Structure formats: C-alpha cells, structure tokens
Amino acid sequence: TANLMFDSWRRTGIFPEENSYYLPQEYDHITQCTLYYNDKELVEIVGQMPPDEKMVVFVKSRRDMERYRKFFGDEAAYFCSSNNAGGAMDPIEKCVNDCVLQKRILVTTVALYNGIDIEDPALKHIVIELWDPTDIRQAIGRKRPINKKDTCQLYFRSLPKQYITTTREKTEYWLEPGQARIKFEAGRESIWQEFLKKPTADDQIKEEVTLTYSPTTGSYTADKMAIALLRDKDQKLRKMEKLGYEKFMEEELWSSMGLTAKKVRFKKLEDYLENVQGQMMQKEELRAQIMEAGQIAPPTGRCKNRPLGQIVLNREIRQYGYEIKDRTDWGRNSPTRGKTFWVVTKLQ
C-alpha cells in the first residue's frame, strides 16, 4: 500500500525525491521456507511441531478460520476484524498480550497487521495462506526477533489455478464500476452509461469498493486509491495465472528475501518408504499407504474418480530419494507368478 502511495506522489511531484529514504528489510531470522498443498498437510505439520513452539497461521477469510477451528479447537486462538460479516472471534488480548502469543496456535486474517507486534521467541512457525506479496511481507513482519537466536520457519500454501482465476475475476468485478466512473469524470459519460446497463451494475455499485457516495450531492465519485490498489492486485493475479503460484512467488517474493521454497516432508512417509523398500506390493495397498503417510490429497475435478498413478506418486516421493517401479513376479513356485507389482526403490 505504501509503495503505491509513494509512487503516485512521485509522479505528481507531491513527494520530492530528496525526501525519499530506503530502509532495507532483513530476513536473516528465517531459517527455512516450505511449501504445502492442503489442510491435511498443515495438520500434520502442526503434529510434528515441538510442544514448546508456537505457530501463527495467516488465512484469507473468516471462513478459513472456521474451517481450521474444526481441526485445532481450543488449542488455537482466532482473530479477525470486528467489521467482518460474521463479527469478531477472540478478543486481541486473548490472542496476543504484551507482544506474546497466548496460545500455541493463532489463526488470523490480515486484521493482525494493524500495529500488532509479536516479540515471542517461542513463535517458530509462520504459515502463509495469502497470495499478495505486499500482504505477505506485512504478515511476516509481525514477528519481531529479540535477538539473533530468535528464528522461525515459513510455510506457504500453494494455490491452484482455479482459485487464482476466481480471485482475479472478483477483483475485476470490484474494479469495473470505479474505472467506468473515472472515465465519466473525465468527460466520457457514455462509458458510465454503458456500465449501468449491466445486470450486475446495481450490486457492484452498492458494494462501494471503488466508489464513494456523497449524501450531499447524491452521486458517486471514483475512489482513486482503491482503484490503484485493485489494479495492482489485478496485474499480480494475471501474472500468477500465467506463471503459476510457485513461479510467481519465486519471482515476486522469495528471491528478494533470499529464500528457496522446498516441498513439505513428513517423517512418517520417510520411515514408511525405508521400511517397504524392495518389497513387491499390490498397487492399491502401496498407493493407500503412501497417500496416508504423506497426507496426499485424492484427485479432484475431472480426475476425482481415478486413482493416483505411478507418475503422480513418484513426483511426491522423489524428494525422499525413492521412486516406484513395476516388477513382475517370476518366482517358479510363486502363487502370484506372472503378476505385476509395484516396488519402492532407492534413487541412484
């Protein structure tokens, strides 16, 4: 937000360049950056967390918070704005008090940004389910390390393309009335009149995301700062649609922070692969065991009725140093002679 304001002020000459100062952001306290993909993986990450360590989970909406409350229950605190459609959840003093987390887990929205600092050495895990790099930097900045030993790990939830597309479409839905009104204010009244013919125009206007209503004049004006913010988000979402979540984050965030994101690993799966290495197993059994130990979600969409194949499973387990191969049983007296099985083998 601040960068957009500063850029606008520089363009208009309000903000002289000689009054501009750059303060570099430091991320030396971040020791690891991990990617995960679904709720089950996050629950497993929490399960692997040492009992004396704490976690903050930044989510996109109250709906996400309600979903995680089913997993974490009273073990976590839940904080969102009181202006939320569903109202407030836990009061801030039951979430963060005197800069210290009050429970082992805090699930929160971007409402935590507003001047709330966390100076708690036990906070070792920050989970990010947001997508905008500006919001993410703000979220990470809530932790204020008290010394060089006060470090933490980051976890990013990879977002599917469908979510990115839906978010872009919603952003453009909010943006449309403001952009039409700007053109109206510049003398192009026909653009505004054309927008008013849309069946969704009344709803878009009533939301007042990019418009401000004046009771005095009985008319709307374009909210130029809101429009600038949404244009910025729209550009980012279009780039993310094109590159994919992980490549976008690498270009827009991780590289500038000196981070390399790695896929989440689970010791349970690591131990399982080591134990079954070399054994001929039924495809169905091995598939089910790997999915359970690795918290791998079943396929969705058009592929939801198809079992995960060898290619997909190998993509998941190669980071552990293993892969699945076909092997036919040619044992002379074997009751399964001639049948093909799956075998977990160690990568060379």
Descriptions of predicted regions:
Residues 1-5, 59-62, 107-112, 158:
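A short beta-strand-to-loop transition that corresponds to the Sensor-1 phosphate-sensing loop
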Residues 172-348:
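The feature captures the C-terminal accessory region of ATP-dependent helicases
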